[in-house]
Amino acid sequence: FLRAWLKEKKPPLQALRLSFSADVEDDYYTYPKFLKWDRELCDKLGEDRGQIMLFIRMPSRHPLDKPLYNPRSPYIRRVLAVGAKYKARLGLQCSYAAGHRAERIKQERMLFEKIFRQKPRGLRHNKLTSCEPEDLLQAYFSGFRNDYTMGYADVVGFRLGTARPVKFINPNTRLLTELILHPLILRDLTLSDPRYMALEQAEAEAVATDLVRTTARYNGELNLLWHNDLLSPQAHPWHSVLY
């Protein structure tokens, strides 16, 4: 209701109706569609060459973590059921607040395991707010061994200078850790958002195609980040096609 009323500026009565409507009437409920695409591709390539990660953002009261939702809600349970159907691995997306208070990472992991009764298969930060080496150290000490945050919002590409995962180096000891950083190659908002690259569809397709081919040429890991809302044609005209 609050998302439809405050974010989408729908009239209160329409927002109330949407909050009680079936999932298929929700423009943002794109999970069955894109998870089916992902599973078809993974089955074609083989499990050793493709993985589906479904990240669940942990709630906080920080303004940039809105909307504040309940991870125990029936809606989230339905999303998880779709993820399980298509064999998606469940990851933890830390709140934006955790990007500024690293001690929250462990707290949010404990909450994740309590609610979903499983260990998260990976970590990423909301809005890519893994800002300091201490954030990565806290992730490591909280039990994470795979981090998918490494990237920047403004430009797509090889932000570590490589398309392959690398181990995090503890800057205090100058030693390798077992925390693997999976560099982000392509992100939906980076391509289209006016604050970033602001590309049109044809330009975005050309950039994405070049990055995919370059990653393949060097036997890299193509790490993609797409948001469920932008995969709705009602929310964005071409991200569903590009994905």
Q: What are these regions, as identified by a protein language model?
A:
Residues 1-9, 80, 102, 109, ...:
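Residues lining hydrophobic/aromatic ligand-binding pockets adjacent to catalytic sites
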Residues 1-77:
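Active-site beta->alpha N-cap acidic-glycine motif
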Residues 1-5, 14-15, 34, 111-218:
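Active-site-adjacent pocket scaffolds in enzyme catalytic domains
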Residues 16-24, 57-65, 88-96, 193-197, ...:
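Glycine- and acidic
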Residues 27-33, 60-74, 95-106, 123-133, ...:
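Acidic-and-aromatic substrate-binding clefts and catalytic sites of carbohydrate-active enzymes
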Residues 35-51, 69-90, 109-116, 141, ...:
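Acidic (Asp/Glu)-rich catalytic clusters
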Residues 54-58, 92-96, 124-127, 148-150, ...:
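A cross-domain feature marking catalytic cores of carbohydrate-active enzymes
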Residues 85, 113, 202-243:
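C-terminal domain-boundary segment and adjacent tail
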